[in-house]
Curated annotation (Swiss-Prot):
HAMAP family given in the database record: Ribosomal_uL30_B (MF_01371_B)
Keywords, alphabetical: Ribonucleoprotein, Ribosomal protein
Biological processes annotated in GO: translation
Origin superkingdom: Bacteria
Residue pairs linked by disulfide bridges in the UniProt entry: none
Full protein name: Large ribosomal subunit protein uL30
Keyword RNA-binding: no
Any one GO molecular function term: structural constituent of ribosome
Cellular component GO terms held in the UniProt record: cytosolic large ribosomal subunit
Keyword Lipid metabolism in annotation: no
Family matches, as Pfam families: Ribosomal_L30 (PF00327)
Length: 60
């Protein structure tokens, strides 16, 4: 299955609690931290909810 790299590019400080929890659930803590996750519908939905805070790249 394909994988995606998710990087926290903007701070969740001052955002809604749901968005902060989503960032934490993705495994992102500090600014510019990155995680590699499987590309599935659940992860894509979480990324879509905080798309203004993260950047996404395909991993080959």
């Amino acid at each position: 299955m394909a994988q995606i790299k998710i990087t926290l590019s903007k701070s969740p400080i001052g955002r809604k609690p749901e968005q902060r929890k989503t960032v934490a659930a993705l495994g992102l803590g500090k600014l510019n931290s990155s995680v590699v996750k499987e590309d599935n519908a659940a992860i894509r939905g979480m990324v879509n909810a905080v798309s203004h805070l993260v950047t996404v790249e395909d991993v080959k």
